[in-house]
């Protein structure tokens, strides 16, 4: 059984939300180090970094439901990292991420922050916990 992760990445003011069982490998794909990155991210060039990883899903479908919900919080045209993070908190605070998703409170999630953020005061639902990772600990050993 593999754990599916929803991730938020950022590069030069652009953001992207995706799902992967291996977000480190997926980030390498987005940065063009190995093949398979999304067209959107490869067109923006290398330099993508994880902002946060969200885990705790029971299966791939649940992670994809949250990914969809984050991408569809209105207004969809509002870009930038701060707006993306606000949309993420909004999606996490819903009773259900989609009409067919389980009750959000039945899926205990954990956010692992990889970048400092300052998008104002926010309140996560009780079923969501968070930790902050030191940047030095993020670098993969060679």
Q: What positions do the PLM features span?
A:
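Solvent-exposed beta-strand motifs enriched in subsets of small alpha/beta binding domains
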Residues: 49-56
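GIY-YIG-like beta-to-alpha core
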Residues: 4-40, 56-73
């Amino acid at each position: 059984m593999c754990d599916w992760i929803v991730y938020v990445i950022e590069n030069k003011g652009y953001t992207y939300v995706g799902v992967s069982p291996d977000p480190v490998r997926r980030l390498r794909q987005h940065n063009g180090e190995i093949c398979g990155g999304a067209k959107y991210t490869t067109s923006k060039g290398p330099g993508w970094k994880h902002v946060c990883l969200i885990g705790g899903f029971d299966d791939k479908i649940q992670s994809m439901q949250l990914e969809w919900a984050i991408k569809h919080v209105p207004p969809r045209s509002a870009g930038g990292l701060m707006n993306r993070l606000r949309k993420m908190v909004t999606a996490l605070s819903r009773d259900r991420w989609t009409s067919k998703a389980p009750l959000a409170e039945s899926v205990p999630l954990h956010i692992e922050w990889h970048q400092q953020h300052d998008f104002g005061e926010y309140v996560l639902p009780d079923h969501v916990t968070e930790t902050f990772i030191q940047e030095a600990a993020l670098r993969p050993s060679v």
